[in-house]
Amino acid sequence: MKRLLIYIIGFVLTTAVASAQDYETAYRALQQQFEERSANTPALIKTYLDQYPYTPYSDEIHLMEGVLHAEKEKYKQAIKAFSKINAKNLSRATQPMLHFYWGYALLKQENYEKALSYLLRVKQKESLYTPHARYYAGYCYYCTKDFQNALTEFLSVQHLAGYQQIVPYYLIQIDYAQGHYEKVYERANQLLDTFPDNQH
């Protein structure tokens, strides 16, 4: 009887270790596919979750799922995936990605107040997403007519590539809304001088 019990315990432990190695290897492969934005990543995510429903990487997997949905402009599905995540289980380096994409998806659903709550978290620590979070936070403030905070955020990114041509338009509109007509004239002339062929 004792020998049988030892055999059973040994079998269970061996199986558990093999299973842990399997889901670990599969997760690393999935992570690589996600980083490369491989076309079959959504199918691999589904297969992984079906095969390993109790994986300790479920939060990371749902993050990948949500990001892919957001990038394909499927914002409701992105929000649904993000809501399955316990952000505390993600690494500190990964949390800005969650908060940025969640905030962005909410912004695209015109839920500006809630979007701000996520975008402002990204600003707390400098990351790849910080300048983009500042711009979209500015946009949320702008849409809710909180022009002073919008101005602060837009000014913080106005000189960054990708925002140099669009931000001045918001600054001009904010100046106009606040009755700063001299600034409107000054910014408009500066914009035309700097970007005469701007399509915005």
Where are these regions (language model features)?
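Acidic, polar-rich low-complexity tracts and alpha-helical solenoid repeat scaffolds
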Residues: 1-5, 10, 16-200
